[in-house]
Every structure is written in C-alpha cells, then in structure tokens.
C-alpha cells in the first residue's frame, strides 16, 4: 500500500510539474511573459538563472554518477578527487573554447572570465575533462581505469546538459532561425541577431537539445546497466548519439561558433561520430578482459 501511495504521489507531482511547465512555456513562447536573466539582484550581488541551472545540472549528475561508481566498486574518495579536477578543467575548457571563437567580443581578461554571464561550450568542457581524467589515471593509478571513468562521466553528462540548456532559455540565447511553427518562441528585439531583427519568433533549439539530451541519458543509462561488455562502450555511444542530435539541431542555430563557413559544433560532432562508431566496434569485438584500457 505504501508503495502504491508513493507511486501515486510521484505521478501526481510529476503531472502538476509538467502542466505548470507547459503553461509557463506557452506564455513565454507567445511573448506574454518576458524572462529575466536574474533570479534576484541585491546591490552588487546577483544570482543568474544560467549559472544556477548549470550548477543544478552538475550536482544532480554528480550524485547519479557517484551512486554508479559505488556500485562499480570504485573508491569514492578517488572518484571525488577526479571530479574536482575534472570540473575545473571542464569549466576552463568550456570557456576557453568559446572565447577563442569570439575574441573580438572580449576587451579584457576580466570579460573573458565572466562565465556566469553565459558563454560555455560543451565540446570544450568534454575535451578539458577527458584530458584531465587521462592524466589523473596515468599519474595517480586509482582503483578505476580511464575508460571506466569516462563511461561514468558520459553516462550522466547528457542529464546535466539537459538541465543546463535551460540556462540558455533564460538568457534568450541558443535559439534557431525564424519559424511560424506552433511551438515557435518569441525573442525580444535586443536579443535577436541583426539579420533577423524584423522577426519575432524563432525555433526553440535549446528545448530541442534538452529533450534530445534526456533521451540520450535514458538510452545510455539502460545500456550502462544491461548491455555493456567493455569499458569505453558507453563513452563511444555518447559521442555518437549526442553528436547526431547536435549536428541536426545546429543547422537551425543562429549563434553557432564558426570555422570559416563551417559550424564548429557540426564539424567536431562529425569527427566524434566517426571516432565513437569506430571505437564502439573495436570494443565490442575485443577479446580483452573488461578492465583493459
């Protein structure tokens, strides 16, 4: 009986949440409600939705990963130490990647350090975290392998990304080209690109990616628990699945980082798909024990 009541309570709470979210989004997307970047501002102190949602996504992902690490028999002190270094490297990598593609917008080093105002690139974060993880495993010789760590990391990363994308929502960024589809999103004129200043409604690409990230998280979670044969398989699948969605969604984005006439995210995603697919085939066909690599 208690289990039934608990299930009904969760179901009712979830239903109310999604009903509220639907109503709220419909008001924002129609332009009836205009968003603020700030949760509150008191004097010189301000708390932004962007940084709060990024932090929320990280914390939820961290606790899910930590539980999985415990089930894997990993030393949790070593796991926490890796996370500490990985987070620092991920933030630096995410910001550095973004700033390098937008140098003309940063007049000083201080401007480049203002990560709470937005401007983080997931590809830079992944590169920074992976490099740090590799060095940590090589130098520290912990209770886990590098690929075991990356599987834990990438199995929960899409969940954090799905939550973090809503920071773009409150910043009125990461939206797509103009559209008249029923789910079109109103963007105030100050946030519109100059070439689209006469348009009011745009693709909510932040929402597309958030939904895709959630789907990837659930797919990877099922694979992690039921079908994984070798460490590294989940990492490869993350590269493939996330990148497939990113390539499609990036086509609609109006604020993409560019390499010449090529969207950087699409180019890097294509490379990751190739690497992930190849790596997955190699790992699935490998006869080496699970702790290899």
From Swiss-Prot:
Record PROSITE patterns: LGT
Protein residues bound to a 1,2-diacyl-sn-glycero-3-phospho-(1'-sn-glycerol): 165
EC assignment: 2.5.1.145
GO cellular component term of the entry, any: plasma membrane
Main location, first listed in the record: membrane
Membrane disposition: Multi-pass membrane protein
Keywords recorded for this protein, A-Z: Cell inner membrane, Cell membrane, Membrane, Transferase, Transmembrane, Transmembrane helix
Transmembrane intervals: 4-24, 45-65, 81-101, 115-135, 204-224, 231-249, 262-282
GO molecular function term, any single one: phosphatidylglycerol-prolipoprotein diacylglyceryl transferase activity
Compartments (UniProt record): Cell inner membrane
Cited InterPro entries: Lgt (IPR001640)
Organism domain of life: Bacteria
Pathway per the UniProt entry: Protein modification; lipoprotein biosynthesis (diacylglyceryl transfer)
GO biological process, one term: lipoprotein biosynthetic process
A Pfam family that the UniProt record links to this protein: LGT
Function: Catalyzes the transfer of the diacylglyceryl group from phosphatidylglycerol to the sulfhydryl group of the N-terminal cysteine of a prolipoprotein, the first step in the formation of mature lipoproteins.
PANTHER family per record: PHOSPHATIDYLGLYCEROL--PROLIPOPROTEIN DIACYLGLYCERYL TRANSFERASE (PTHR30589:SF0), PROLIPOPROTEIN DIACYLGLYCERYL TRANSFERASE (PTHR30589)
HAMAP family (alphabetical): Lgt
Family note: Belongs to the Lgt family.
Name of this chain's protein: Phosphatidylglycerol--prolipoprotein diacylglyceryl transferase
Organism: Thermotoga petrophila (strain ATCC BAA-488 / DSM 13995 / JCM 10881 / RKU-1)
